[in-house]
Amino acid sequence: MTARHFLLDTDLTSSEQAALLDLADQLKATRRDRKPARRPLEGRSVALIFEKPSTRTRLSFDVAVAELGGHPIVIDSGSSQLGRGETIEDTAAVLSRYVDAIVIRTFAQDRVDRMAAAATVPVINALSDHTHPCQALADLQTIREIRGRLAGVTLAYLGDGNNVAHSLLLAGALAGLRVHVASPPGYEPIEQVVRHANEIGAVTGGEALVTHDALEAAAGADVLYTDVWASMGQDTESDSRALVFQPYRLDEKVVEAASPDAIVMHCLPAHREMEISAAVLDGPRSVVFDQAENRLHAQKALLSFLLDETTAGVGSR
């Protein structure tokens, strides 16, 4: 049987995505109420490969695997042969003999794809330079539990058209969201991603729009979202990016342009008074810590979806 991977947001269908979010809600409620939970990963091991530093992704996956009954094995590239030149293909082949799934957080999407091509167990993209699909699942769960729905909701993303923006566009399209991205010229999301999102949206009712005007994107939005201006590996560009992205800061003026009950999201870590004002990040509309918590529940649902035979067919193609 061929392993099912989660490399891009679009590796799920709309119905699979909805079923996975339903499962995430159920798992969250079970944990909150301290009820006995199923342990579908009992006796299984999951390798967690981190080639980039991580707090939320590492901890949430570690806890997720453990709470599902499995054994998480964290592998830092600096302390393994992977960081000393062993090929990603050889690593995938060996790990497939030891573990039941591989989670990888790395720099290039190509490394995720190559890992999956050589592995015989499920591979999960925990972040690449192209997408951040696990983050988007948690974001959708957060929006749905607060707004009560996803279809027809307008999300305004301000800032760099990066991996988070790409995943919001693609996952949002599957869910029927209207995703409006405001980025400076030259920092927009990849055109192919925007086009693909609109192709999906033509079926689901979603929409992908890119503008250079932050207030235009935010006008009437139900969700306001931002991310850091300089991602890991772009440290030398921090000062120049700060100047370019200043008009895209999520501040009180942007909040006023949005819907009166708009929520504020940030995938964290945040730099107060840079991409977002402290008043907005710490204000009553902010749901950033609910969003961070939902990484755990969404990833438990994803692991169950890929590895638990009792849920594998839910919402299937």
From Swiss-Prot:
Domain of life: Bacteria
Pathway: Amino-acid biosynthesis; L-arginine biosynthesis; L-arginine from L-ornithine and carbamoyl phosphate: step 1/3
Keyword Repressor: no
Any Gene Ontology CC annotation: cytoplasm
Any Pfam family hit: OTCace_N
Catalytic activity, as annotated: carbamoyl phosphate + L-ornithine = L-citrulline + phosphate + H(+)
Annotated compartments: Cytoplasm
Binding residue positions for L-ornithine: 163, 227, 231-232
GO molecular function term, any single one: ornithine carbamoyltransferase activity
GO biological process, one term: arginine biosynthetic process via ornithine
Enzyme Commission number, as recorded: 2.1.3.3
InterPro entries named among the record's database cross-references: Asp/Orn_carbamoyltranf_P-bd, Asp/Orn_carbamoylTrfase, Asp/Orn_carbamoylTrfase_sf, Asp_carbamoyltransf_Asp/Orn-bd, Orn/put_carbamltrans, OTCase_ArgI
Keyword annotations from UniProtKB, A to Z: Amino-acid biosynthesis, Arginine biosynthesis, Cytoplasm, Transferase
Binding-site list for carbamoyl phosphate: 54-57, 81, 105, 132-135, 267-268, 295
NCBIfam families named among the record's database cross-references: orni_carb_tr, PRK00779.1
Homology family: Belongs to the aspartate/ornithine carbamoyltransferase superfamily. OTCase family.
Function according to Swiss-Prot or TrEMBL: Reversibly catalyzes the transfer of the carbamoyl group from carbamoyl phosphate (CP) to the N(epsilon) atom of ornithine (ORN) to produce L-citrulline.
Name this protein carries in UniProt: Ornithine carbamoyltransferase
